[in-house]
Amino acid sequence: MEPAAAAPAQRLADPTGEDRAPAAAAAAEGGRSPDSVLSAAAPSGGNGGAAREEAPCEAPPGPLPGRAGGTGRRRRRGVPQPAAGGAAPVTAAGGGANSLLLRRGRLKRNLSAAASSSSSPSSASSAAGGLPASCSASASLCTRSLDRKTLLQKHRQLLQLQPSDRDWVRHQLQRGCVHVFDRHMASSYLRPVLCTLDTTAAEVAARLLQLGHKGGGVVKVLGHGPPPAAAPAASDQTPATELGRDVEPPPSSSTVGAVRGPARAPPADLPLPGGAWTRCAPRVNPAPSDSSPGELFAGGPCSPSRAPRPASDTESFSLSPSAESVSDRLDPYSSGGGSSSSSEELEADPATVLTGPSGPPHHPVRSSQPRPPSPKTSALLQPKAPTGVDGTGLVVGEGPGDDKAVAAAAPGVPLWTPGRIRETVQKTSSPPSLYVQLHGETTRRLEADEKPLQIQNDYLFQLGFGELWRVQEEGMDSEIGCLIRFYAGKPHSTGSSERIQLSGMYNVRKGKMQLPVNRWTRRQVILCGTCLIVSSVKDSSSGKMHVLPLIGGKVEEVKKHQHCLAFSSSGPQSQTYYICFDTFTEYLRWLRQVSKVASQRISSVDLSCCSLEHLPANLFYSQDLTHLNLKQNFLRQNPSLPAARGLGELQRFTKLKSLNLSNNHLGAFPSAVCSIPTLAELNVSCNALQEVPAAVGAMQNLQTFLLDGNFLQSLPAELENMHQLSYLGLSFNEFTDIPEVLEKLTAVDKLCMAGNCMETLRLQALRRMPHIKHVDLRLNILRKLITDEVDFLQHVTQLDLRDNKLGDLDAMIFNNIEVLHCERNQLVTLNICGYFLKALYASSNELVQLDVYPVPNYLSYMDVSRNCLESVPEWVCESRKLEVLDIGHNQICELPARLFCNSSLRKLLAGHNRLARLPERLERTSVEVLDVQHNQIIELPPNLLMKADSLRFLNASANKLETLPPATLSEETSSILQELYLTNNSLTDKCVPLLTGHPRLKILHMAYNRLQSFPASKMAKLEELEEIDISGNKLKAIPTTIMNCRRMHTVIAHSNCIEVFPEVMQLPEVKCVDLSCNELSEITLPENLPPKLQELDLTGNPRLALDHKSLELLNNIRCFKIDQPSAGDASGAPAVWSHGYTEASGVKNKLCVAALSVNNFRDNREALYGVFDGDRNVEVPYLLQCTMSDILAEELQKTKNEEEYMVNTFIVMQRKLGTAGQKLGGAAVLCHIRHDPVDLGGSFTLTSANVGKCQTVLCRNGKPLSLSRSYTMSCEEERKRIKQHKAIITEDGKVNGVTESTRILGYTFLHPSVVPRPHVQSVLLTPQDEFFILGSKGLWDSLSIEEAVEAVRNVPDALAAAKKLCTLAQSYGCHDSISAVVVQLSVTEDSFCCCELSVGGSMPPPSPGIFPPSVSMVIKDRPSDGLGVPSSSSGMASEISSELSTSEMSSEVGSTASDEPPSGALSESSPAYPSEQRCMLHPVCLSNSFQRQLSSATFSSAFSDNGLDSDDEEPIEGVFSNGSRVEVEVDIHCSRAKEKERQQHLLQVPAEASDEGIVISANEDESGLSKKTDISAVGTIGRRRANGSVPPQERSHNVIEVATDAPLRKPGGYFAAPAQPDPDDQFIIPPELEEEVKEIMKHHQEQQQQQQQQQQQQQQQPPPPPQPPQAQAQAQAQAQRPFQMDHLPDCYDTPL
């Protein structure tokens, strides 16, 4: 609902004026994090200045993004490999030009390069300085941001920190950097501000206001607290060039960031408009007396002496937004075109530029010794002669003693003396302010004495960082803005209470249409909140604005004019405006939006989530308001500005009935609301209230009073005057007993005291409250109920005691109880009175005895699952109205026969018990849902399916069934069974004919039985079948009669012996077909695939060979999985680990999980696996999938401690999620295998980290060992932490109704209740470790860890094991998306590293690769790159397997191939390297063998768009002429070369060569290079990403394809088609390049002749002695040197 607003004329700014640029930028910002722009850098003091001078004169300082010294665009790089000395290598920016692909702008996947080149040339980069010496310094510049919306922002500049700035920060832990969005600058900079923990918000704001529109670089504002004792003197003598980096190239114009003054306390005064001064009343601190990190959100001052440290559970406090405000706070039109400033913005924070006088600068007289601070300075601040810190926050000297105050000043830089500040303050209409924004939501103005750096550090500690130096490094990353951001001045996007929805310039006419006087004129029209605003003159910045209230009015179509609407207001003085729109689209948009506004009630106003500090003036235009929503703001009772309206003005609304002030961080009860006698509903939840005043008794008409989420311990006795109060919310406070005043509130019928601190419940207090019927005491710490000889409590009908610590519960005293909740306690016995009992919830206890007396005749729902019951109580069978009975997960051995005779029973859940059989002789039963899975049932009752004529659902999986009972004894049947789950039994072929007795069967799961055939005649009768799963049997074929099942949409038959491809492609409705792990050799496809087919899985069929036509047809499927070509066998040594993964969609066929599998992470010595679960969102899992490996690689270079690098990886990932993580979230688990970093020759270490419900289980000696932990409200420490943060836990156990997990990635708007800090556990791998499993939430909700380990322990293939887990979970009742990764281990006693990894080691010899004979991959070095390149151990090792057509080859080469320079030449012409000694763990990595490694160009980009695929690219004509396809996996990181050999053996490329990393050239030679299958090379076409992860189903066009001759068919080969030469298969040369190409070809022919001569000379020589096989392969590769286009000019650098 939009606010009723009418803006006065003077409050509307010109949309085209100067205020529009920052307004639009702030609106586009939306809390998003602008990514770092990485470009080539030179060492400080080197050619950085030259790079700056090369920038255009009209541009701000710094080179173009991605350029250095005139070089072309660069791709993003990963973390630079540290050199021997620990410093990152810095490559000089060499000359070079872009390739043809880059010149044509078709490198669309590398969005970072495109964004850099298209952005304003004023973007600053790091070219002026040097790359940081440590890897941690460059981490923020090397990884990508997942905030893709940042690309849409215009006029956004980013000033980056130089190495000198970072060194200054690292010099002391008291220093840091905050990134401030400087609204005062015309180009809207995100400016880094270097400061200390003592720097106040007033100082920072005033310094930025001082710079104003002049621009500037990095600003340094030093605080005035006591300096550290160990601070070196040199740190204060920083040169001017390091203190500030101005936008102008000449150094003389650089601005000093700050001038140090003496230590003193922060000011408490603020200058007010007109130059007046007043004492600013600080806001009441809602937190406890000790300063806590939570004060950053509550507005409390931070102690300057408190050192930053990790926030403990008892100290941290911050309020979370309510769950209902998640969806209503987004306003995409806020501060859009024509946005106006709000009243409080113009009154409190105008964008006035702070300028100094025009006279010469005044330099104070220096003295040899500084004067100590005056004790009076911290107590008082005189307005006439301010010292130390001016009211504007500018740092000044105090007099002659300030020697060090100006020591860092550069010559020619004016200093701000007290005299100049007073003169400036008189010109300033309001004090400068600094604002803080969390998670892109509401923005709070910081008090003058608050410390921005302290606030930022406390926030990062709350996230989970444990070390101050790491918090310091994280604060220097600009991407932190998506989590916490500072603004200099109130941002327009959050400041406007009249939210702009639509605006534009249209033809407007006022009055009646028939009057000829009113002609059409072009005017600015704005739909703002609930008002239509029309400018009176053409230039909307001048003249008055006409405001037309729309609530109660009407909007009508004008038929006489095209695209014309008539807007009319209500009331006797209604006016009408006719607006003619330019297009029909705009016409419809305005019609729909205004129609909604006009239909609203004029008495209701919604101003929630508007960052209001005081009530806007237009709110008081109408005194007839009845409903006012002001939640999620920062309203104050007494604003500091005199013209502002505080909460005291609310009493002017004499008709107000409903007022919502929740989540306003008030700290004290707003006493003004007690003067509103008409108020019937008041919500002051989550305001850190510690007491309720006695004046509330005056609100005698109040009916609903919400006080949840505060610090209340008592209530005033005056509440008894609220005779009409019917609902009082006291949940999540600090009550230890029931307040006595409730005894007199006779209209209150529900006691809401969940989440308090009650340990005992005195029933005597409830006896004195006969009006209470519903008692809610969940989430307390109740241990016992004290009766005190109380009679029966007949008035209590509903009792909720969930999540307490009760051991026994005797509820017989509640003789009229109807609903009892006692889940998740520690109950052993439970006694209940059953007279009126209707529902019993007692799951997740330890019950062995359950007594209900008398028999509950009204009981309809009973849940006693997950207890220790050994039998079903007798009284259950006598309960005649029982409809749902859940007795699962107990120890019940037998079900009584009378239970099935209950005519009311509809649903019986008895799974996970010890049932050996069901009652033999069943009478007719009304059960519709019967679940008896996970028992020991050998056979079902013979008459079960005949008597249960109402049965629709039967799940008997995981039993010992060998046959099925018949459904009928005749041909006719009355069965209505629709879903039948019989997975994991011992059923044989004999039971298949019995299935025909269920003609209405829709879902049939018979996986993992003993089926050998499925008769065709029986399949033909199941015409209604929609889903069938017959995996894990011994079937050799699927009957052709499956074509009769016209409604079939899912066919799952993996892990069989199927040899013939079934007729599933004839099914019109088929969507998913899984035939993996079979023995298919060929497939038969129709001319046209089924229109709805989305997934086809053919992996694990080693004999399958596809021809080109079939492959071309199958590539049109959204998710087509097939085995990858084998990666050449490197050494024949057994692998230590191999993996298989699978995933399945959940409801609505939506895949919300993702997997990550990197077998050769970080140079083949490590492995990385992960599973990510987004619950119901798709975005977060895929963002985690493509980024976490990069982050982990960077963190490994910063620390070697297992827990620390894993924790930091998850926390940094929280930042990398960007705006996607503000509203969405996802669970994650990562497993990292590596050697001990200290002892590389030692055993392997497996480190697992998880958040959410994704978990890891290790099988050791056949027993499960859990390596994960699920953090929910059932965890005692988590429950305590959440309750301290006053988050609201809903009845389903979710934080603010959003998520059950209290530790999870994303959901940053729930901070600090929900944090990303993971659980980390490390184990040393031993020969007894067989495998480990990573699974998503759906897997572990359906399978226990013991069952999962037992199920796959004897499955030899990792892929088949993962498939089995997924199938079992689905058959056991999982409806969520599932992902499972199984990693098999082969750790032996001698599993230690014996590789010679020294610098003087030798390179391994080459060997045959995977490429076809007519294709060779030539990796060229990039001498023109000035960026530090990522090492092969940068953690981005992965598997590249994706697909695109030949016409799209050109756009994919640049994006999927790595731009990392190789360790050695990969072409067959590269010199032979001597053999290197390797251990079995690290086999020899051959130069032509394929080693999967991530392309840093693809996944290290800051703006990589995961949504782009090859269909988005434009084909380049002239590259290929035929349409043949051959899948090629690019070998880019196979060699581990030593530094000395790298310099010797790299390909020699001319300096003018393009930076294109891969050249694919055709070769006429054919050689029968053998290919061997790798056990871990189970992949997909269109499903595997370059990091080995599983991409979304839509992204299925990522494989690099080359036009070439097809390989000959071999056993186990990939294709079955012979070579098909095409006469048109030739290179097409553009006419303008013919002459140049001729010269190149001529030069090439000369080289070939020279090579032939050399070969002839070698043949004349005597034959050499016999060579080993590897040397022979190397010589053969040398002889088959392909045509390398190394010497092509830049314009002809297209991969051919």
Curated annotation (Swiss-Prot):
Reactions listed under catalytic activity: O-phospho-L-seryl-[protein] + H2O = L-seryl-[protein] + phosphate; O-phospho-L-threonyl-[protein] + H2O = L-threonyl-[protein] + phosphate
SMART domains from the UniProt entry: LRR_BAC, LRR_TYP, PP2Cc
Key words, A-Z: Acetylation, Apoptosis, Cell membrane, Cytoplasm, Hydrolase, Leucine-rich repeat, Manganese, Membrane, Metal-binding, Nucleus, Phosphoprotein, Protein phosphatase, Repeat, Tumor suppressor
UniProt-recorded name of the protein: PH domain leucine-rich repeat protein phosphatase 1
Catalytic EC class: hydrolase
UniProt GO BP: apoptotic process; circadian rhythm; entrainment of circadian clock; hippocampus development; intracellular signal transduction; negative regulation of intracellular signal transduction; negative regulation of phosphatidylinositol 3-kinase/protein kinase B signal transduction; positive regulation of phosphatidylinositol 3-kinase/protein kinase B signal transduction
LRR repeats: 601-622, 624-645, 655-676, 678-699, 701-722, 724-746, 836-857, 858-879, 881-902, 904-925, 926-947, 950-971, 976-996, 1000-1021, 1024-1045, 1047-1068, 1069-1090, 1092-1113
Function description: Protein phosphatase involved in regulation of Akt and PKC signaling. Mediates dephosphorylation in the C-terminal domain hydrophobic motif of members of the AGC Ser/Thr protein kinase family; specifically acts on 'Ser-473' of AKT2 and AKT3, 'Ser-660' of PRKCB and 'Ser-657' of PRKCA. Isoform 2 seems to have a major role in regulating Akt signaling in hippocampal neurons while isoform 1 may promote Akt and PKC activation and inhibit ERK signaling.
Membrane topology reported for the UniProt record: Peripheral membrane protein
UniProt note: domains: The PH domain is required for interaction with PRKCB and its dephosphorylation.
Organism placement in taxonomy: Eukaryota, Metazoa, Chordata, Craniata, Vertebrata
InterPro entries: Leu-rich_rpt, Leu-rich_rpt_typical-subtyp, LRR_dom_sf, LRR_domain-containing, PH-like_dom_sf, PH_domain, PPM-type-like_dom_sf, PPM-type_phosphatase-like_dom
Activity regulation remarks: Insensitive to okadaic acid. Deubiquitination by WDR48-USP12 complex positively regulates PHLPP1 stability.
Organism: Rattus norvegicus (Rat)
Location of the PPM-type phosphatase domain: 1138-1385
